[in-house]
Amino acid sequence: MATVPSNPAFAPTLSTRGRLNGILFVALFAVAVTQLAAMPAIANLGISPLIVGIVAGALYGNALRDGVPASWAAGINFSARGLLRIAVAFFGLRVSLQEIAEVGWSGLIVSVLVVTSTLLIGLWCGMKVFKLDRDTALLTAAGSAICGAAAVLAFESALRSAPHKSAMAVGSVVLFGTLSMFLYPLAINAGWLHLDTMGAGLLLGGTVHEVAQVVGAASNVSPEATHVATIVKMTRVMLLVPVLLVVGLWISRSRKAGQAQGNGRIAMPWFAFGFLALVLVNSMQVLPGSVTQAVNSLDTFALTMAMTALGMETRFSQIRQAGPRALATGAILNLWLVGGGLAITLGVQKLLG
């Protein structure tokens, strides 16, 4: 086995090389994950490359982690942290104010009520009923309330929480989001929910976890419902910024009162402001459509890299400690999204005509 030169001048070079090798390793792994996610058997389930990435990364990280050189750890960590923040910021290019305005007040009100109520219920159930730590409860609630795995990533970065906590939250998104994608169209098409096209779009966009799952579910209802559902879902994504800021304020105040769990601090979510800035850029339509599409594709790949790296840093032994309780919290939230989401949708439609 080669020895590391003792001359300190070599250290930065070796450190940089190891970091780059780690990033390249994650990138190559993400390429394989992207190809795997594109297979019809997986793509037809509405499972995004992000979810496939964290699952595949976790399997590799637990079964073959000794095969990764220690010097690569910095690159893997950068992919799970630094690259993650950049990718979440560029997620803003998928949203425009014009699209949100197209659905009107109905979409905004449904989104705000669903996101707020789901976060509060998730925190209360997770921390008070199932005795989860603050970060795990918040990550699980954010994944259900806002935009699935992307929201988990954003909160994980801001909270600086352990990777296994994100994995548990993503597991909830996978299970209950996939169930919703199949069960919602069945109930809507059978007439059990008594929703018109607008109502179906509001419900699907306002309550299904992942963007891909929303599109998958709504496409089995009608093209019109798919259009409405996608815009409402993007409205929920837009709420990521104010929610992160409010959560940061809450944690900061809890720390001052000496009541916070964990490290009691939240990282400054500069990527949230980047997200908002890119929403404005997309709304002004200053970029050609082809450029926006290319950037969005690169952003999806960067998010896949981040999820893969998080999976590699996850240990199943840590998940087993709180996994059932996190899953139970996700189940309660899913029941709320179905029942409470339907009530909110019908109430808003009745109120606004």
From Swiss-Prot:
The chain crosses the membrane at residues 20-42, 70-92, 105-127, 137-159, 166-188, 234-253, 266-288, 326-348. InterPro entries: UPF0324_pro, UPF0324_YeiH-like. Disulfide bonds: none annotated. It is found in: Cell membrane. It holds the Pfam family Cons_hypoth698. It comes from the Bacteria. It is a multi-pass membrane protein. Its main location: membrane. GO terms for cellular component: plasma membrane. Keywords: Cell membrane, Membrane, Transmembrane, Transmembrane helix. The keyword Cell membrane applies. NCBIfam families: YeiH family putative sulfate export transporter. Belongs to the UPF0324 family. This is UPF0324 membrane protein PP_3661.
